[in-house]
Amino acid sequence: MEEDGSDWGGLAPEILINIISRLTIQELWTGPMFVQKSWLTVCRDPYLWSIFDLEPWFDSYPESTHLWSPEFEQKVDLMLRSVVDWSEGGLTKIRVRHCSDHALSYAADRCPNLQVLAIRSSPNVTDASMTKIAFRCRSLKELDISYCHEISHDTLVMIGRNCPNLRILKRNLMDWSSRHIGSVPTEYLDACPQDGDTEADAIGKHMINLEHLEIQFSRLSVKGLASICEGCPKLEYLDLFGCVHLSSRDITSNVSRLKWLKEVKKPDVYVPRSGDVAQTERYGHWRLYDERFDIQAMRI
């Protein structure tokens, strides 16, 4: 291949698309788009943009306050809006972080076939854009709104009422602040939602078809857990890690009614870092419970 890429320049667009489709998002975004104009045109083909997944990049990048800056959010927004345009309405999966209401509303207006939406750690996504998602993306099957503090139980109600195909919900919260200091803004850590039972009630009343639920570090009580177990009879997986207001007895007595349940992730024991005595006392009550969940034994 010549340095200017001319040997590839004569390839039919469908062949180029086939080749480029094998690249990761990061490879595509930093490579072929800058080879020549014809390649840029091919890289914008709707066929390549039914899925927009930045999770592999975020997983490989160390958490830092830079990711929470307005400048970084603008970059993510620009990428998301561009992909929405290139998909020509065919986008079915979005997995990003640190986006805003503006970009998400833009996607909601133009991607009615969206089935998977993951926007964890997006401090400027609110109920406003999520309401648009609820009304305009009714085919939604999976939703991850973990660490999104400006999203309230109102979103859970609207999604539950308007997206009957929802099977997976991830609403995990951040754990004890000491593990995030230095990488997450302090004011954001302090604003972590406290209304666990209200959110649990919304889930139980409006998400009857849920099969997979993650609510790590929720502040829900046994009342909230009862609402979920009563209202979501199809649950197969329930993640309660870090939900320290629930005892082993609370969990066992409530999940026993879930006949399809395959796995429960219990609050577990917190293993503190050196010198973190206060946290040991807070989470140490789980040391009283060393029995393991036996789902089969709970069934009649």
Swiss-Prot record:
SUPFAM superfamilies the UniProt entry points to: F-box domain, RNI-like
GO cellular component: nucleus; SCF ubiquitin ligase complex
Pfam family, one: LRR_6
UniProt signal peptide: none
Positions of the F-box domain: 11-52
Entry keywords, A to Z: Nucleus, Ubl conjugation pathway
Domain of life: Eukaryota
Main location, first listed in the record: nucleus
Pathway: Protein modification; protein ubiquitination
GO biological process: protein ubiquitination
Cell compartments where the protein resides: Nucleus
Chain's role: Component of SCF(ASK-cullin-F-box) E3 ubiquitin ligase complexes, which may mediate the ubiquitination and subsequent proteasomal degradation of target proteins.
Record's comment describing the protein's domains: The F-box is necessary for the interaction with ASK proteins.
Subunit (UniProt): Part of a SCF (ASK-cullin-F-box) protein ligase complex. Interacts with SKP1A/ASK1 and SKP1B/ASK2.
Protein name as annotated: F-box protein SKIP1
Protein's organism: Arabidopsis thaliana (Mouse-ear cress)
Organism phylogeny: Eukaryota, Viridiplantae, Streptophyta, Embryophyta, Tracheophyta
